[in-house]
C-alpha cells in the first residue's frame, strides 16, 4: 500500500492509516524543526493501480533528529502537494485541496481526478520548498479516474494492487450458516417471505460484469446507494457472476436459526444483529460518503480526520449527544442532561417517533458535526438500528461512550470495549457513572480514545470498503449451487455517462476491423 517513502522506515516502525507508531519517548520536541528529507509519505494514493473515487495518502512530520512529531509542527511552514500529468501532452483536472492536519504530527492528503492519464502522474510533496521523503513520486502507469470503466480482469491481481486483507472476520462469520446457496429455493421463498407491500428487497444479478436488478416491495428507493457502489466496483475489477437479494431497509430480516426447518436464506443487508443471519455489507452511509468525498457530502471518513476540534486537554469536559428521536433511550438522555448539565449535554434535533415529547423535552439546535469534537466525550446511542454516526465518532479524538446494542456494522468485530470505546448499559443506567470515571481517569480515557481512533483509521479506509464488497460477492458466488440468470422483470443498471472525461483503458483490447 505504501509509496516509495517506505524505503526510509526504521525496522521497528509500522505504517498504516493510523501512521507510523513510535514509542512516546521518541516523539520530537514540539519546537524542533521539521526535516523534509526525513519526513515520511505513504499510502494508496501514491500507487497508480489503486483506483478509488478520492485518492489519498499520508504524511508524517519527522524532525532532523529522526523523531516523529506527535503534534502539529511549529511555525507557519506547511506541507503542500502538487499533482500533474507526467506527460505535458496530457491535460486533466485534478482537485487537490491542502493536506488535512490530523493534529498528531500526521497529515492526510486527498485528491480527486476528473479525467484519466495514460502516461502517469507526477506527485510532488513539499515542506516549504523542499521535497519530502522520496518526492517527486512518479506513477509511470495509467492512472484512472472514478468514472473510467476499466476493470482489472484478474481479481487476484486487483486485490493485490488494493492491498486487500486476506480474510475479513465478519465475512467468515456471516457465511458459516451458508456452506451452499440454493438459488432455486431463494427464488421461490424470498419474494414471498420478505417482499410484501412494505418490503425493501432488491433482487440483483451480476452477469458478465453488468448489473441487473428488480425491486421487490414498496420501499426500495435506497437501491440508488447499492447501485452506485456496485457500478463503481464493476469499473475497477471484473465481478463474479452472482445472483443475490439485498435488503435496503433499516433492519436485518433473516431471523431463523441454522437448525430450524427450513433454515435461513442468505439475504444481504447493511446492518446485522445478534439474532439475525443476514450477510453484512458496509452501510450505504459510509459507502455513499466515500463515493462523494470532495464533492457531494460535507461529512466523510477522510475530511473528518482533519476536523477533530481542540487538543484533548482543551476540550469541554462533558459528554455530548445530538440526534433525532429514533429510539426512546435518546429521550432518556435529554432527561439525564437536564438533571446533570455538568456531565452531559444532550438534545433532540428532530421529532418524528415521539412528537408528544417535544414540548416537555424541547428541541435542540442543529450542530455542525465537526463541532461535536469540542467535547471530550461522545455518547453513541442506537437509532432505529446501529447508529451510523459511530464510525465518524471513532475517527474524531473524543472518547466514545457506546450503548450496548444487539445491532452491528461490518467493522464492529474489530473493536473491543475498554480498548476502543467505553461500554454503557442498554438502559443507560450507568452512563453518568462512566462519564465520572472518564473525568477521574483522564489519561486512561485519552488512551482509549486514541486507540479507537487509530483502529478506525485502519479499518475505515475507503479502499477497504471496495475490498469488502468484492469479497462478499466472491464468497457468495463460490457457494452458489446453480448459475445466476437475468430474471423476468430485471433491468440493466447502466454505467453513468462520462463522455466528457478522458478515459482510454489500456486493459481493453482494441476492436479488430475485418479486412
Residue locations for each model-derived region?
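Short coil/turn segments at secondary-structure boundaries
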Residues: 71-75, 96-97, 112, 123-126, ...
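Secretory-pathway glycan-assembly enzymes, especially type II membrane glycosyltransferases
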Residues: 89, 106-108, 115-120, 127, ...
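Aromatic sugar-binding surface patches on proteins
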Residues: 99-110
Amino acid at each position: 500500500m505504501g509509496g516509495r517513502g517506505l524505503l526510509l522506515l526504521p525496522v521497528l516502525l509500522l505504517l498504516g492509516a493510523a501512521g507510523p507508531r513510535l514509542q512516546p519517548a521518541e516523539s520530537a520536541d514540539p519546537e524542533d524543526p521539521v526535516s523534509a528529507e526525513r519526513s515520511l509519505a505513504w499510502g494508496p494514493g501514491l500507487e497508480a493501480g489503486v483506483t478509488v473515487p478520492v485518492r489519498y495518502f499520508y504524511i508524517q512530520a519527522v524532525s532532523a533528529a529522526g523523531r516523529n512529531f506527535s503534534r502539529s509542527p511549529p511555525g507557519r511552514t506547511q506541507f503542500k502537494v502538487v499533482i500533474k500529468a507526467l506527460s505535458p501532452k496530457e491535460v486533466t483536472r485534478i482537485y487537490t485541496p491542502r493536506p488535512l492536519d490530523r493534529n498528531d504530527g500526521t497529515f492526510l492528503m486527498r485528491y480527486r481526478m476528473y479525467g484519466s492519464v495514460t502516461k502517469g502522474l507526477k506527485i510532488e510533496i513539499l515542506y516549504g520548498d523542499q521535497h519530502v521523503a522520496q518526492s517527486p513520486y512518479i506513477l509511470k502507469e495509467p492512472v484512472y479516474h472514478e468514472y473510467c470503466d476499466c476493470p482489472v480482469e484478474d481479481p487476484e491481481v486487483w486485490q493485490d494492487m488494493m492491498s486487500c486483507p486476506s480474510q475479513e472476520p465478519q465475512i467468515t462469520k456471516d457465511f458459516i450458516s451458508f456452506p451452499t446457496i440454493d438459488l432455486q429455493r431463494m427464488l421461490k421463498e424470498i419474494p414471498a417471505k420478505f417482499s410484501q407491500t412494505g418490503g425493501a428487497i432488491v433482487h440483483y444479478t451480476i452477469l458478465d460484469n453488468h448489473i441487473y436488478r428488480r425491486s421487490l416491495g414498496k420501499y426500495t428507493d435506497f437501491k440508488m446507494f447499492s447501485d452506485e457502489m456496485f457500478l463503481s466496483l464493476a469499473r475497477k475489477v471484473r465481478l463474479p457472476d452472482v445472483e443475490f437479494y439485498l435488503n435496503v431497509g433499516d433492519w436485518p430480516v433473516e431471523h431463523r436459526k441454522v437448525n430450524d426447518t427450513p433454515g435461513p436464506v442468505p439475504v444481504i443487508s447493511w446492518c446485522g444483529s445478534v439474532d439475525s443471519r443476514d450477510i453484512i455489507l458496509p452501510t450505504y452511509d459510509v459507502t455513499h460518503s466515500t463515493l462523494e468525498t470532495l464533492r457531494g457530502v460535507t461529512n466523510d471518513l477522510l475530511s473528518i480526520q482533519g476536523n477533530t476540534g481542540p487538543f484533548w486537554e482543551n476540550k469541554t469536559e462533558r459528554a455530548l449527544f445530538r440526534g433525532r428521536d429514533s429510539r426512546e433511550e435518546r429521550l432518556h438522555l435529554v432527561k439525564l442532561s437536564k438533571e446533570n448539565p455538568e456531565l452531559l449535554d444532550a438534545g433532540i434535533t428532530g421529532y418524528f417517533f415521539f412528537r408528544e415529547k417535544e414540548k416537555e423535552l424541547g428541541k435542540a439546535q442543529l450542530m455542525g458535526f465537526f463541532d461535536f469534537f469540542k467535547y471530550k466525550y461522545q455518547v453513541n446511542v442506537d437509532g432505529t438500528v446501529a447508529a451510523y454516526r459511530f464510525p465518524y465518532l471513532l475517527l474524531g479524538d473524543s472518547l466514545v461512550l457506546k450503548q450496548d446494542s444487539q445491532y452491528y456494522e461490518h467493522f464492529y468485530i474489530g473493536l473491543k470495549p475498554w480498548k476502543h470505546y467505553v461500554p454503557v448499559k442498554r438502559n443507560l443506567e450507568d452512563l453518568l457513572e462512566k462519564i465520572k470515571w472518564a473525568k477521574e481517569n483522564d489519561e486512561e480515557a485519552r488512551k482509549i480514545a486514541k486507540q479507537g481512533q487509530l483502529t478506525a483509521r485502519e479499518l475505515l479506509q475507503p479502499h477497504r470498503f471496495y475490498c469488502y464488497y468484492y469479497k462478499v460477492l466472491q464468497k457468495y458466488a463460490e457457494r452458489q449451487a446453480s448459475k445466476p440468470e437475468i430474471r423476468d422483470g430485471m433491468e440493466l443498471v447502466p454505467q453513468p455517462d462520462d463522455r466528457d472525461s478522458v478515459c482510454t483503458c489500456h486493459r481493453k483490447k482494441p476492436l479488430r476491423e475485418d479486412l
